């Protein structure tokens, strides 16, 4: 309610992030913390909360790296999506703190590949439209944070990487939107064709 009354104040957004806890592998919380820091009147405590979130996520990322060779062929959709979310937050953390552009680009590309694969999961998938919106928003807010917080010596290079990551993420979403629209049109066409065939068959039977 406080957010609706005065969206320029960041504190309620920080509280929403805290309430989200580890929902969607902490991606929901990261969204609200970054949104809080992007507000006209940010709540500075969100920085610490975001840092704690990133540190916790790094531990999970290292665990996933150790298990990668063992579980890479696991096709359980939600497990794949949770792993992607951990990778996504790892890239976000790198964009805000790492100076290793090569590592950022490598991690970013792997994360984008996994995102593309996860977007093909539709039935009973935890990668909902709401979550995709939050991920896209995070990618844009990361660019804003890079502009505000990174040092001049690395800002331009990291900024380029952040923009490239956000644009690629958007392009994957647009591509999958087109694929799903095409599939919907094909299904509608097939349903109409089948209905017409049934109607023709019934009419033929009546004539006989």
Language-model regions, residue ranges each:
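Alpha-helical solenoid repeat scaffolds, predominantly canonical TPR units
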Residues: 5, 13, 32-33
């Amino acid at each position: 309610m406080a957010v609706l009354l005065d969206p320029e104040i960041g504190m309620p957004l920080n509280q929403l992030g805290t309430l989200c806890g580890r929902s969607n592998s902490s991606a929901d919380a990261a969204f609200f913390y970054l949104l809080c820091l992007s507000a006209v009147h940010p709540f500075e405590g969100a920085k610490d909360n975001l840092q704690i979130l990133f540190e916790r996520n790094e531990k999970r990322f290292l665990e996933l790296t150790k298990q990668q060779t063992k579980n890479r062929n696991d096709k359980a959709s939600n497990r794949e999506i949770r792993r992607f979310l951990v990778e996504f937050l790892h890239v976000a953390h790198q964009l805000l703190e790492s100076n290793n552009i090569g590592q950022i680009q490598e991690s970013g590309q792997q994360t984008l590949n996994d995102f593309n694969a996860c977007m093909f999961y539709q039935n009973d998938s935890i990668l909902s439209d709401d979550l995709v919106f939050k991920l896209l928003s995070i990618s844009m807010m990361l660019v804003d944070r890079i502009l505000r917080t990174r040092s001049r010596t690395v800002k331009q290079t990291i900024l380029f990487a952040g923009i490239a990551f956000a644009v690629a993420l958007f392009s994957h979403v647009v591509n999958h939107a087109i694929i799903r629209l095409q599939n919907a049109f094909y299904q509608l066409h097939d349903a109409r064709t089948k209905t017409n065939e049934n109607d023709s068959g019934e009419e033929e039977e009546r004539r006989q």
